[in-house]
Amino acid sequence: MSIASYVLVAFRRHTDTAIEAGFKYLILGSVATLVMLLGIASIYRETGGIALPVTATTAGPWLRIGRACFLVGLGLKSGIVPLHTWLPDAYGRAPSSVSALLAGIVSKSTLYVLFRISLGLGMQAETLGLILLLFSFLNMTVGNALALLQRYTKRLLAYSSVAQTGYVMFAVGLGLRYGRPAAIRAGFFLLLAHAVLKALAFLSKGVCHYHRDVTLTRELRGTAAQIPLVAVTFAVALIGLAGIPPLAGFAAKWWILTESLPAPDGWVAAGIVIFLVNSVLALGYYLPLIVRLFDNSGAEG
């Protein structure tokens, strides 16, 4: 899947930016794979095998190194801050249909594998939960802050994916550290909802680009006048991603918040505040996009 993704990102080979983004994605993806291979070698040195049932019941320094390697490698492939630098370029410069595939399937499946492999390798649920909570704060804050600064629509959507990954990590980390399985289910529900909604957003953006050569966020004005159905589908996707009722994005975030209360300690209390603040910050770039879609002052004729 990774090799196909590298090629698809650079599919528009007649443009230097696509080649650059594809090459950057290839290099960083290869580094992630090499780090995970180093992890496999470390685990094999400790246990004499790579079967998960064996590694889950074994302890040792090389096994800890192996777990760390898998966390770093899969974290890079999932776009976890500060290993996310490839993601805006890959999402922003690939064809919109490829961006939808990357956001909807590739990154999400890698994040799921990170959760499963880390536990399968015997990492304590409480330890993994704390790691996910800490990095979720970074993802939410960095993703939303950088999205607010973007002028290019696809890069804005890319950085919002970084933030959405943080919401999922917060829910799963909460569930693992404090033994709240419903929080984990809420996180996976948000993961699925985001995959569908973000894919819809990228596909809608692709149709806008095809019909109107839209690249910048301000160029979305007049979309409803010229291609009203696309404006509606794009708006639905953005409303869901913003967590506005009654769509799945709101339901998932509400579920996560209800499972985080009452806060068992300061980490979760801080996480709830960061979660809410970032959800409000996200409205600062989602709502202007929705308004521009239905602002006909930019329509021709």
What are these regions (language model features)?
Residues 5-254, 258-283, 291-293, 297:
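Hydrophobic transmembrane alpha-helices and their helix-loop junctions in integral membrane proteins
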Residues 1-2:
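Hydrophobic alpha-helical hairpins/lids featuring a short glycine-rich hinge
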Residues 299-301:
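Short, intrinsically disordered, charge-balanced linker/junction segments flanking boundaries
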